[in-house]
């Protein structure tokens, strides 16, 4: 089964509020995006691994006008478009694997990723991811990234993950980005379990 087939099956068979990473609002992500854009509502923003999360909904409601979303699952994108209704036309959609996606160069001020990067357990895939972010984010722009923290789970959705502290994450991105901020946050899953996330802000050099 390919990665795309795997994630299509996840989004076909599980309710949006039943997956472990579900949160009714992505308040930390929105707050960090507001901060790094200095509330510039025309800042180009892309959400990597958008899934069925409500980040684009929240950013649209907050007045941001240049939004894109990427996910490997066409099923997730279709459901997000349905949820948004006519507003989905105000978002640019990419159905692709982030390690091989074709993205415009120097296009984005903000690259947001909540819970994709930690699934990249092989170094070549991480290197492709960093290269994609380097090429797509404008110098001075930011990556807002959330991964499992050092005490986070070892698996998610049945797949292995890599846990990070801020020093480890900074080292992975060091050739093109500098870490400017990080914080640990506990996420409560729909099943009531606690998962530790690391939120990091990295500035494009």
What are these regions (language model features)?
Residues 109:
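Conserved acidic residues
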Residues 115-119:
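Short catalytic micro-motifs in class I SAM-dependent methyltransferases
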Residues 1-106, 120-136, 142-205:
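Class I (Rossmann-like) S-adenosyl-L-methionine-dependent methyltransferase catalytic domain
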Residues 112:
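A conserved beta-strand element that flanks and buttresses the S-adenosyl-L-methionine
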